[in-house]
Structure formats: C-alpha cells, structure tokens
Amino acid sequence: MQATRSWQLRVPQETTNLIVDSPASIAHDDLREVTRDASSILVPVLPSSIDIHAASRCIADLLLVAKVDRRDRKLAVVANRTRKNTKSFEKLMRFLDSLGIPIIAVLRDSQNFVRAAEEGIGICEMTPYKVKKDMEQFEKIIEWLDLWRTRGYQTVDTSVIEQSPNVTMFRKPGVGSS
C-alpha cells in the first residue's frame, strides 16, 4: 500500500527537530520544498571524487536554486568516513576549504559506526572510552545544531545525526541511509 505524499510529509506537532535524509541530487522543486523552513542544513561529503562532484552540485543547487545564503551560516559541511594522511582526505579538505562554508566536523572511517549499525544502536550508546574520538566530532555537530535551536528555530535538516527524543526521521520514499 502506497502512502500519499501529504501523509509521507506529515510532521507530528510535538516535533522540535526534523531530519531530512535525501540524495545529493534532488529535484529542484523538492529541494526548495524541503529547505524552505530549514534552520540548518548539513551536507555530508565522503573523500571520493564521485562524492565531491555530487556534493559540489548539491551545494550549488542549495545556493542557487534553494537560495540558501551562505552568510546566514545555516549551511555547513561534515567530512564523512575520512582517513587522515591520505591523498583522498587532502583532496576532500582542499575542496571543502574552497567552498567558504563551515566544516563543522570530520568523522573518521571507524569500525565503531559499523558495529553500532550492526547492533542497531548509536555510537553514543557504546562503551565511552571506545568511541571517545568519534563522540568528540559528533558533539561538534550537536553543538552546531543546538546553536540554531537556542535561536528559536524549529527544524533541522541533516542526514548525520542519530534518532533521539523529539527528533523525527524523514526519508524520501525509496531513499536509503547515506
């Protein structure tokens, strides 16, 4: 049974944060719709040429189509699954530095994320000393998002934060996790 679009986009009234997980290439009308009321937008980027290219198009669409103003500082980037001291990491960081958009976290390519997914838990639920480095980066993301919440905004648009109380996960139909 297929749900109607309005049902899929329905947000419970008690929701304080809304996470939209979308592909990098989203139709322009949909992009405008999902970013219209966004208080913050996070773009995760992997250290690969393919992902860098997709992210550059996504960010261009956010700036030019959705009219997100980078001076508002509500748009940020997260480097995802990185390995420092590699050429791909250097290439990714050069690309991200060239954007003029804040890089708020650099998530490492860690087995902690694999284990957490296998166990169906978030890394914050794992043994603290084992995930210390990963949690330091996640805390940067959470702090950045909290900055927007304390300013009175109601929605968060991201694809990297785990589900927590008062957060509703929304995925476009047919789209898997990033």
PLM segments and residue spans:
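Intrinsic-disorder/low-complexity, polar/charged segments
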Residues: 1-3, 48, 86, 128
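P-loop/Walker-type NTP enzyme "switch/lid" segment
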Residues: 1-28, 32, 36, 117-121
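Generic hydrophobic alpha-helical segments
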Residues: 4-8, 62, 141, 145
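Residue-level detector of alpha-helix boundaries and kinks
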Residues: 19, 43, 126-130
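Conserved catalytic-core segment of NTP-binding enzymes
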Residues: 23-109
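C-terminal lobe/tail of nucleotide-utilizing enzymes
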Residues: 74-178
